[in-house]
């Protein structure tokens, strides 16, 4: 999927940003790294909210951003929020692609679906200023598009090249009004009062003539628009998010029979999910290590509990064994860690490391193929070596068909990525490495040898600077000592 954004938080303009299987966003503090992630979460919580009249849900459950003026670039009311999404064939559910509706078109497979939404705020009344959707098919030159533009008052001009956006009873009337142009229907210049359900047009009161009113009431209640909603809802429902401050470990957890419980923004339900699904089978990747230090991934199938233990214990080496044990007749349960001394201790007795990485591993393993996992600063409370190994785990999820978006400050994480690309165990074509500098998103070009063609200023070069400073200081002290000894000999 590609995303375009204008006038959202720190982003003034970002065009066709490619969310690759592994997207890594880094940069200085307060530089705008989180803005793109926040927009994705705003769209997600808007789609999942039952209040269809709300055009944009800015607060809860995934992110809270305040009022509309708070999310506008530089807080200027003249700046109108815009976002656009491009879904490619692999992003579109099979049920939509194989539907009778699109087979009826008989123009080939869906190549991509594009949606653009532009907002305007007038006297604290947020409304959709412009809406555009286009279905593009593999057959050369064949598209279906609908463009709505609000001009004055609540009236929208309607431009489309297909009657398929409308109800069946309206199609015949539409055919009588439009003109033929290169075998495509053109309907231009008609105006209507249009209502939106979230981002989707769903009804209209015609404003041109009484003749039209017979046909156009709720004319957007069509399959074409319902499929648009299905594509978006399917994609965003498969997004899970783990914020930078994950839940603190507890001595025990209350049992909950809710099998639909999600991971939580802080990973607060990771223990519950592990307890509920411990014996569930998962397909995941393991690592084969070579003496040279290179690795090779291979598929495996095991229980969730064993898969979690493989990564946290065998790879990260943060414990000998992790196990969920029920207590008080199953009313509560405890996550116990078998440590290097052979002692079984509650998870809250072993520091923050295990509890911080547990939600990442659990959610990563149970997420389905074609899902998206967003991680903000996953390296917090982790040893540098584990930060490096975390990249190996995250890339294993990519190989399982999952999409990962990571915002990170970890040079260990990115250095490990470059190493794995150079060694050939990670594919550079699956990676988008972005550095945010002065609120500008700069995609860094990685070569297949793990090198960067452009190295931004202050991009993880502090370690090199400090090492050079240490060597310089050591050399200076050594020279002073030699000079002192030389004078003493005299």
Task: Label the predicted regions.
Residues 20, 96-99, 253-267, 448-451:
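Short, polar loop/linker segments at the starts of domains and inter-domain junctions
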Residues 103-109, 151-192, 252, 268-275, ...:
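Contiguous hydrophobic segments
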Residues 1-90, 95-97, 297-487:
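Switch/communication elements of ASCE P-loop NTPase nucleotide-binding domains
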Residues 23, 46, 139, 143, ...:
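Residue-identity detector for threonine
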Residues 1-250, 324, 421-426, 432-438, ...:
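P-loop NTPase switch/coupling surface
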Residues 189, 213-349, 482-490:
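Extended helical coiled-coil dimerization/tether regions that scaffold
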């Amino acid at each position: 999927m590609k995303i375009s954004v204008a006038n959202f938080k720190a982003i003034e303009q970002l065009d066709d940003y490619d969310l690759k299987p592994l997207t890594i966003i880094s940069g200085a503090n307060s530089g705008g790294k989180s803005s793109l992630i926040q927009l994705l979460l705003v769209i997600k919580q808007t789609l999942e909210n039952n209040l269809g009249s709300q055009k944009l849900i800015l607060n809860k459950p995934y992110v809270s951003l305040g009022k509309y003026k708070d999310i506008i670039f530089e807080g200027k009311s003249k700046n109108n929020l815009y976002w656009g999404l491009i879904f490619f064939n692999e992003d579109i559910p099979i049920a939509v692609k194989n539907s009778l509706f699109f087979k009826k078109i008989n123009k080939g497979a869906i190549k991509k679906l594009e949606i653009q939404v532009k907002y305007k705020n007038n006297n604290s009344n947020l409304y959709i200023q412009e809406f555009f959707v286009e279905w593009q098919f593999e057959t050369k030159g064949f598209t279906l598009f609908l463009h709505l533009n609000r001009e004055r008052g609540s009236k929208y001009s309607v431009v489309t090249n297909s009657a398929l956006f409308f109800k069946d009873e309206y199609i015949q009337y539409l055919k009588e009004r439009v003109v033929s142009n290169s075998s495509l229907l053109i309907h231009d210049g008609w105006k209507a009062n249009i209502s939106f359900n979230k981002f989707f047009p769903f009804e209209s009161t015609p404003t041109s003539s009484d003749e039209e009113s017979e046909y156009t009431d709720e004319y957007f209640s069509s399959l074409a628009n319902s499929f648009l909603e299905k594509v978006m809802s399917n994609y965003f429902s498969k997004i899970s998010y783990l914020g930078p401050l994950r839940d603190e470990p507890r001595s025990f957890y209350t049992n909950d029979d809710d099998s639909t419980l999600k991971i939580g923004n802080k990973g607060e339900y990771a223990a519950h999910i592990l307890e509920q699904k411990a014996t569930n089978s998962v397909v995941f990747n393991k690592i084969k290590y070579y003496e040279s230090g290179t690795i090779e991934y291979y598929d495996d199938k095991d229980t969730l509990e064993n898969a979690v233990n493989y990564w946290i214990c065998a790879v990260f080496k943060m414990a000998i064994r992790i196990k969920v044990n029920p207590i008080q007749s199953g009313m509560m349960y405890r996550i116990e860690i078998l440590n290097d001394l052979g002692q079984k201790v509650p998870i809250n007795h072993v520091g923050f490391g295990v509890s911080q990485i547990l939600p990442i591993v659990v959610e990563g393993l149970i997420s389905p193929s074609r899902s998206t996992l967003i991680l903000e600063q996953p390296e917090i409370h982790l040893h540098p070596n584990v930060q490096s190994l975390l990249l190996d785990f995250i890339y294993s999820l990519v190989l399982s068909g999952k999409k990962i978006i990571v915002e990170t400050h970890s040079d260990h994480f990115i250095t490990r990525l470059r190493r794995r690309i150079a060694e050939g165990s990670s594919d550079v074509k699956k990676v988008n490495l972005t550095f945010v500098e002065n609120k500008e998103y700069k995609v860094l070009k990685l070569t297949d040898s793990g090198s960067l063609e452009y190295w931004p200023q202050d991009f993880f070069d502090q370690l090199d600077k400090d090492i050079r400073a240490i060597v310089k200081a050591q050399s200076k002290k050594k020279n002073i000592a030699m000079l002192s000894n030389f004078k003493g000999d005299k």
